[in-house]
Amino acid sequence: VTFDRVQKLGVKLAGVVVDKYFGMPALKLDGQMLACMASHKSAEPNTLVVRIDFLERDLRVMNEPDIYYLKPHYLNYACVLTRLSLIDDAALRDLLESGWRFLKKKKRSI
């Protein structure tokens, strides 16, 4: 499983572009990171970081800990760590859509 799969699903969302974030492949929306491959040493290999709100993150980690997880470095950020090798396309699409809605809502509230 590679970022190519993430990219194919992500660019279907309005306004999403492919870019880099801390040197890693990323999807951005309005200049903000939506999803990127994890670069921090605490993350497992082949981990995708996706921006979502804290409540949804906590629910995902609690309900599907094999797919979604956290490390101390990421606790204060509105994001979830995702094991790309274990997530199917439907769940990945849903996650990216949630992140897209989160960033759109965040932008409207500014």
Indicate where each model-derived feature is located.
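Charge-dense, helix-prone N-terminal extensions
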Residues: V1-I110
